[in-house]
Each structure stands twice: as structure tokens, then as C-alpha cells.
């Protein structure tokens, strides 16, 4: 697990933002090429790629970028997000998280598991499926959105928090290369307080939910302990099944996301402590801003969270 200091990221942001952004992006890019090489080497025997990881790990963008790298190697990749198999709100009883007093939106019961299992079985058999699309703003599932079928020299990349769960995926695992994505780095404050990986992911999720899912930061904070519970229940038990791993953290992102959080939580810093995110509160006003827009590439994983 990599460790960065607050002093380091502030110094890089203040002294040479362009080089800081480029170095972070290049490190992530190198990881993707190593993973793509392994996928390509196994694609005839394993035409399925499963991408798993906790909330706000950058699964969607990493999926897309791996697909483009593989295309250059002559391997066409179909993309499927398990998020598109969520059921329409109001058509089922959402499981309740008694521990945190909120709906358990991470539960696999929120997904159309019968449809997903049917699609996975038919895909491996070479049949065509019609993938749905889930609208997070209206929480509505749109069926038969696009066709997917595996042909020669093609693979399917399936990303989602339940992608390693054998109860859901069945025998698909033997046809698959499994890739685990997450923020796997720690930020150390001036007093050696640890900002843990899940806290860095919270920053991503808070901004993404606000910008793209019509959910204010306060709501994301209230849900966060339940999200973490879901990760312990639905992701951590299967993490060891991964064939490959990617650390999607870009150190310069903290300089961007902390500025956003500071603006949104003026006078409400105690909410961070209530969500077990106290170290973020300690650095709210201690992270230097960064002039990143001229240097951040169009395919950066951060676009998934900040637009």
C-alpha cells in the first residue's frame, strides 16, 4: 500500500501542477497496460473479464480504458455495468440496513438477479443478449437498451461491486480473468493521522453523487456507513479471488476533491465525524488547491467523479 504525505501533495500541487498531474496519470496508465497484457494473453481461454471493487474505485472508467487498450491489440471488448441491472424503484421492497437505519442500496437484492444470471449464461454460450440501462436520476430500469454478443477475438468486461460473488456469477468464474480495483493508498497528515483508502473514496463518491446522481453531500454522508457495511458484506469476502489488482488513486485528486468538500460543508464539519471520517475534517482547510484543468487528460479516471 502506497503512502503519501499531505506535505508532499501540497508541494507538488503548488510547485509544478503539470508534472504532478502527468506523473499520477502515468502511474495509473502503466498499471492498466500490465493488466491488459494479462487479459490479452488469456482471452481465448477466458473471454470474460470481471472488474470488482468498492464504491468509487473508478470501475467504469478503468473498464473503458482497458477496453481501448485491448482494441489496439486486436481484441474487441464489450462493456457491461452491473449497475444497469438494478431494478426500478417501487417495484420491490428495498432491503433495510438495521445497523445504520437506512436502505441497503448495496444489497444484491436490489438487482434483477434472474435477468443477470440468464444474460451471463447466454453470453458465454455465444447467444445475443439485450442489456438494460438504469437511470439513476429517476431510478428506473430501461429494458432492451442494446445488444451484446460474443464473437471470435472478442471479450466481455463486466464491472460491478458484486462481480466476484459466486452466488450471483455462478460458473462464470472459470471463464473469467478477475481484476480488483480500489484506492489502495493512504494519505498521512502533518501529525501522522491516517486518511485511509475508504476516506479517499468517500471524497470521490460525494462529488460524483452531487454532480451526477442528484444527491447532496449530506445524503452521501448519511449513507456512507451503510456503503461501508455493504463492502464488508458483499466485496471483502471475495477480494482474494482477484487475479490482478489496480490502485486507481491519483494523489492530485485530493487537492481537487477536498476543495469541493470544504465548500459544501461550511459549518457542518461534525457530519464527517459522525460518518467515521474525522481525519478528513482535520485537513479540510489544509489542502492546497491545484490548477489541474489544463493538464488532466480527457480519459482520466477522475472524470467519472468530477465531470
Annotate each PLM feature.
Residues 49-51:
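Hydrophobic anchor at the beta1->P-loop junction of P-loop NTPases
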Residues 45, 115-174, 221-238, 253:
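Glycine-rich phosphate-binding loop used to anchor ATP phosphates in small-molecule kinases
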Residues 58:
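Conserved glycine(s) of the Walker
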Residues 68-78:
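Post-Walker A helix-loop "phosphate-sensing" segment adjacent to the P-loop in P-loop NTPases
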Residues 78-80, 87-138, 155:
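Conserved nucleotide-sensing/catalytic segment adjacent to the nucleotide-binding pocket
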Residues 1-37:
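Charged, amphipathic alpha-helical linker segments immediately N-terminal to NTP-binding catalytic cores
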Residues 61-66, 81:
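Hydrophobic positions on the alpha1 helix immediately C-terminal to the Walker A/P-loop
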Residues 17-22, 29, 166-307:
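Conserved NTP phosphate-binding and transfer environment spanning the P-loop NTPase/kinase superfamily
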Amino acid at each position: 500500500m502506497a503512502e503519501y504525505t499531505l506535505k508532499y501533495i501540497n508541494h507538488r500541487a503548488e510547485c509544478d501542477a503539470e508534472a504532478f498531474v502527468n506523473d499520477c496519470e502515468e502511474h495509473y496508465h502503466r498499471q492498466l497496460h500490465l493488466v491488459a497484457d494479462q487479459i490479452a494473453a488469456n482471452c481465448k481461454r477466458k473471454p470474460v473479464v470481471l472488474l470488482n471493487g468498492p464504491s468509487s474505485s473508478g470501475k467504469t472508467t478503468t473498464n473503458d480504458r482497458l477496453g481501448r487498450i485491448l482494441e489496439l491489440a486486436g481484441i474487441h471488448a464489450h462493456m457491461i455495468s452491473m449497475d444497469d441491472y438494478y431494478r426500478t424503484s417501487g417495484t420491490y421492497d428495498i432491503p433495510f440496513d438495521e445497523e445504520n437505519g437506512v436502505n441497503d442500496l448495496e444489497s444484491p437484492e436490489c438487482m434483477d438477479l434472474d435477468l443477470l444470471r440468464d444474460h451471463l449464461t447466454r453470453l458465454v454460450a455465444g447467444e445475443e443478449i439485450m442489456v438494460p440501462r438504469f437511470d439513476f436520476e429517476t431510478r428506473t430500469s430501461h429494458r432492451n437498451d442494446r445488444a451484446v454478443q460474443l464473437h471470435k477475438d472478442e471479450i466481455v468486461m463486466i464491472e460491478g461491486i458484486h462481480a466476484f460473488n459466486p452466488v450471483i456469477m455462478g460458473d462464470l468464474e472459470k471463464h473469467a480473468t478477475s481484476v480488483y480495483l480500489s484506492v489502495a493508498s493512504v494519505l498521512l497528515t502533518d501529525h501522522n493521522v491516517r486518511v485511509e483508502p475508504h476516506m479517499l473514496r468517500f471524497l470521490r463518491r460525494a462529488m460524483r453523487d452531487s454532480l451526477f446522481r442528484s444527491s447532496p453531500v449530506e445524503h452521501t454522508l448519511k449513507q456512507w456507513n451503510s456503503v461501508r457495511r455493504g463492502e464488508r458484506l458483499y466485496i471483502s469476502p471475495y477480494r482474494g479471488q482477484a487475479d490482478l489488482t489496480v490502485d486507481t488513486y491519483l494523489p492530485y485528486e485530493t487537492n481537487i476533491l477536498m476543495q469541493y468538500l470544504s465548500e459544501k460543508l461550511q459549518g457542518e464539519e461534525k457530519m464527517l465525524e459522525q460518518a467515521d471520517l474525522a481525519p478528513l475534517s482535520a485537513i479540510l482547510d489544509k489542502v492546497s488547491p491545484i490548477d489541474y484543468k489544463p493538464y488532466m487528460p480527457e480519459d482520466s479516471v477522475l472524470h467519472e467523479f468530477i465531470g
